Amino acid sequence: CRNQEITSWSIKTSKGSIQESHQDALGHKIYNIFNSNLKGSQKITSSGIVNTKDMLGIVKGLQEKVNPECFLRQTNLTLPCRKILKLSKNLKRKNNDTITFCHQINEIVSKSIKYVSGSTSVSTSAKKSIEQGKGVCQDFAHILISLARENSLPARYINGFLIEDLNAQEHTTHAWTEIYVDDLGWVAFDPSHNKCIDEKYVRISCGLDFLDASTIKGVKTNYSGSDCLLYTSDAADEWLRGGL
């Protein structure tokens, strides 16, 4: 998209081979990694440099072939509960002003739970996080998605990076929400920070929810052993370091 420009990108694996497969209907580049040696661990490293721009939250230049209405469908992670439905009970779109309504529900969701690191897992639903009153960025995103879809607004989960503190030594993955607004297209809201995204965000993938937007998925054949996935990430601001 025009919000960001990839100047370099590479994917490496400690075992097996990597093949670029195709570009899916949402514009994601798909790579296949084949590994017949299942003993021990496998390390996959993806790295690159991305130039970003502040587009006031509007995501421009997406290469997609998917009707936005596909993102009206709720999933097990976004199904609304009574508490979620109550969040916008008294809200109405005045004069069909959808963008103002989106800002309102984003602010409401930002206050609906407290951010508590490690309080939920990747399988935690919007219902569970709002009932316990705490969560992490993915939970804020799921609640906003649930609320937007309940109000007939297509919404989707975004997986990416946020350089929140330019002086921090490490930066990890982040999650936010895109809501489709007529005449504007997809607009990105970060309910965990109660704002639209800016140049500090790097967009990686999108989907119906966390699971659908996952960047790594695997298939096992003729294998009965156990498996686990450990994921680490780091994003750095090159401008701060004098690189751009």
Language-model-detected regions and their locations in the chain:
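A structural signal for short, well-ordered beta-strand segments
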Residues: 46-48, 177, 233
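Hydrophobic/aromatic-rich core segments of domains that either
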Residues: 139-224
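Intrinsically disordered, low-complexity N-terminal segments that are enriched in acidic
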Residues: 1-55
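Hydrophobic alpha-helical segments, chiefly the membrane-spanning helices
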Residues: 242-244
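A mid-sequence, solvent-exposed acidic-amphipathic segment
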Residues: 104-157
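Acidic low-complexity segments
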Residues: 43-116, 125-131
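Conserved small/polar residues in nucleotide/adenosyl-binding loops
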Residues: 231-238
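Short, surface-exposed linear segments at secondary-structure transitions and domain or protein termini
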Residues: 17-19, 68-70, 196-203
